[in-house]
Amino acid sequence: MLEINLSPIYYRTGLNSPVPFPGLPANASAYAHQLQTYCAVTRTRNYPQVSTWCQTCELAQTCPVAQLQPLPQHGTLCITNSAVTGGGKTLAAYAYGVQHCLTGDKVLGVYPTNELLHDQKRAICQLFQTIHKRPPTEGIDGELLVVDGEFLRQEKDAGEQNIKLIEYILKRAKIVLTNPDILYLLCHHLYASSRELTGRTITAFSILIRDFRTIIFDEFHLYNSKQQAAVLWLVGLSAQLFSTVETPHPHSFIFSSATPLTEPEFAEKLAALNALGVSTVTIQQPGEFQGRPVMEAVKLRLESANLRAWQGEEKAIEFLPELQTVLHQNPHHRCLYVMDAVAAARRLKQELTQLFNPEDVGEAHGFVRPEEKRQALRKRHTTGTSGIEVGIDFTGDYFKDILLFEARTSAQFLQRLGRIGRNGREGGENIAIAIVPPEVLNCLLEYPQLPQPFDRTHLPMLIEYGFRYFNPEGFVGYLEHYAPLEAEYTSQIYLKGFEYGKNPVSGEWEETQERRLTRNQLNQLIQTLYPGHNRQTARQALRKLLANGTISGILGFRDGGGVVEANIYRAIGGKRENGKPLNADFSPLFNLEIPYFDYAKSQQAQTFPFHRYSLTYLLRRTHCRFITQAEFLDYLQPYNHYPETPTYLKQLAQANPMNYAIVYGDLPKPRRWHFHTNSGQYRWVKQGIKQKRDYPILDKVRRISGLSIELEKTEAALDIDILNQALEKRDAIAYIGKGNAFRYAIETHLPPLFELCPFRWGASEAQYYLAFDLNAFFLSSLDSINPACII
């Protein structure tokens, strides 16, 4: 055990600055990073005005914003704000945009989780109220709109396409909050499935870039390499494609992150865009010893458990009687429990209901519905997983001051610790218990004696040192191997929006000057971001992925590429030598999200016991039974009058699930199972004759079929045959490697909860592992070989 008393972090107030920062309560003043971010955005709109502010501002001598040169009308400024957690980054990012959104300067906010999306809406509404003295109008025709998958399903009329709705929203709303998935679908034209919708997609994207001059990416340090590539492409497009379009102001991209962006690959590529008119500025404010407390004092305790063997759950349960005593002595405390696994969070909830009033205990994770999560966050005890660690402010109704959490990496540790102590109190009593790997605790115990209290501004360096052998793989190879292919696909679809013209002299149909200019701009952007690539090399690689049926693995996300695959092939066109469409012989893809009926919840009055969750989790951790669609709909029929039912039916129709289940409860111990196939894989040999292999093609991304599930112990009640019948009708985009999945994950430092499944081939006892969809390409990007061989 190691105890550390963390000192508060303060930010100075009352700075001598003429900057008219908006949105502050009476008798309050802005922090340095807030003034600097506001000035940076204002500089892109009114450079002379900001220059006069610098003349009398006490920050001017050391302020990075003061060094910025004027941007051209079509320039782009990228602002990175790395102020500490709880330091007011949301206010800094949105102050200018909310102040001017009613006069044509629209704002787009992008959040990595839907929980954070709805949580931050509260803060932005408060800011709007403070600035404009009234709340923003909300809804489809309002000034502020949250656009996620649930909203699109609710608002879309029967038969209407999402892109039509998005186009309508972008024209009317002043502030739009969304998630990276919807932005990715829009910017990569994946809503396009016909000539009409291709045109609408391009129009919607053009409206986005033309009208939304401030684009904010919150919690940017959580973005993986694919998401970073998408952001780089968007920044490049804003500077390149719209350099000749009449727009009133340059763009401002704000990357808000409590952790300084240390990924050199992203920073290098962002710097490379300087050649296209993109400027960058980094704003940091680490903390001071006087002013307003932005992070309160915390009594931190580190305990160890073998997290690789999932022993954090048992360790957390050991601490519950101790917490019960603390809460008995101090009834005002409220507790948050953040675990890695859903099963651990559910088990913890069950244990807590034995010690405390069950009405005071809630769970917020992927196994419960969104409205139930929001209710759970208000309870005295809230258990959850990674979804609640991302930027949610546990203040106000969500207030918590005791935290028990697991941490497998330094980023997890710092992110989760930052959930409490954000209320600006002097003398607040905050307690945090961190369960870390034994190696980390032993390393920190050997560290020279730590001063007490410990300066919290030095904590990141200490924690990163302790976790230095546990830092997860970042898959930076994806940026070089596969991001250029995403860019090429987008370029091809975008160019479909430009007509060919008839030469009045020759009478031949030729490329118009506008299309030629756009084509050259796209090629220059790909070459700038990805040296060594151009549209020709990327096109050749893209054709391979289209032909072998794996393209939706990189253009899809989360649930896989099954939802967008049909759109991809309809939009890109192309046929094989036999005249068939490229995807004519493909079966539908796996969708590992399974709709299920929660039997235990159905016994509770006024609850809607239907949800969706990962097939691999249901197999591993639940007492369940697989059923047919007809049986599932029979269970759903008595709930037809519930308000949740129409939305749930829309989700089912869109997802095209491959199977259904009933969940009766949690298993006391994980079930052991693996994927299996007897199907041979084929490849062409030099003589042009197909040759059957009795072992899988390893270390490649392939489209495979014939997968089934095998259990190590037979369970007739599971009805696994129903599941396997559905699997037989599906294809999967997969990467197959040889070896033990658990050992490989440790050796390669895969991120926590990276989905890697055990796999068997035929009658062989050899161990293999599978990764599906985007994860398959992530593993492929680890191979330091010729990219052409990877594909």
Q: Model features per residue range: what roles?
A:
Residues M1-I791:
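N-terminal helicase ATP-binding lobe
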